Regions:
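Alpha/beta-hydrolase fold nucleophile elbow
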Residues: 96-109
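Short glycine-enriched nucleophile-adjacent loop
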Residues: 111-123, 132
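Active-site catalytic microenvironments for nucleophilic, acid-base chemistry
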Residues: 90, 94, 120-124
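Loop/turn elements at helix/coil->beta-strand transitions in domains of secreted/extracellular proteins
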Residues: 48-51, 99-101, 128-130
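N-terminal cap/lid subdomain of alpha/beta-hydrolase-fold enzymes
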Residues: 1-73
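Alpha/beta-hydrolase-fold catalytic nucleophile elbow
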Residues: 5, 105, 133-136
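Phosphate/oxyanion-binding active-site loops and adjacent basic polyanion-contact surfaces
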Residues: 73-85, 109-114
Length: 143
């Protein structure tokens, strides 16, 4: 499962540390104690049924281009999807996962992005995703 968040700037850490990863941030019983948050094992980790690859597209989290001026090449809807599809294709080839089912998980704008990435995977990389998981997705909006 390839997971990414939305934008602008939202890293996949929220999916990793708040939902699917092996450890999650515990903010206390009321969920508001950020000053004393601690990492705990996640009894609901998705690792029980899928591999997880968290991706921060260019401009999100710590993901940046070597030359700051090159970032604009990644900020279009189509180019964003094509780059992520290529990254997924390279990852699966390098890690001998070409025959494994590939799920695309997107949160917020990532839900919109997931559909575009799935299409780019199919049309540009010859990879047919097994499914899309949309977490609180942006389904309609002006970009």
């Amino acid at each position: 499962t390839f997971a990414f968040n939305g934008g602008p700037g939202a890293a996949s850490a929220y999916l990793h540390l708040g939902l699917a990863g092996p450890r999650v941030a515990d903010f206390g019983p009321d969920g508001r104690d950020g000053a004393h948050a601690r990492m705990v094992d996640n009894p609901d980790t998705w690792l029980a049924f899928t591999d997880l690859v968290f991706i921060d597209p260019i401009g999100t989290g710590w993901s940046r281009t070597v030359k700051p001026d090159d970032a604009k090449n990644f900020f279009g809807v189509r180019s964003d999807a094509q780059v992520l599809a290529k990254a997924i294709a390279l990852y699966t080839a390098k890690n001998n996962r070409t025959s494994s089912p590939k799920y695309i998980l997107g949160e917020s704008y990532g839900g919109f992005r997931a559909v575009k990435v799935a299409r780019a995977l199919q049309h540009d990389q010859g990879i047919v995703p097994a499914g899309i998981i949309a977490v609180s997705p942006l389904l309609e909006g002006s970009l």
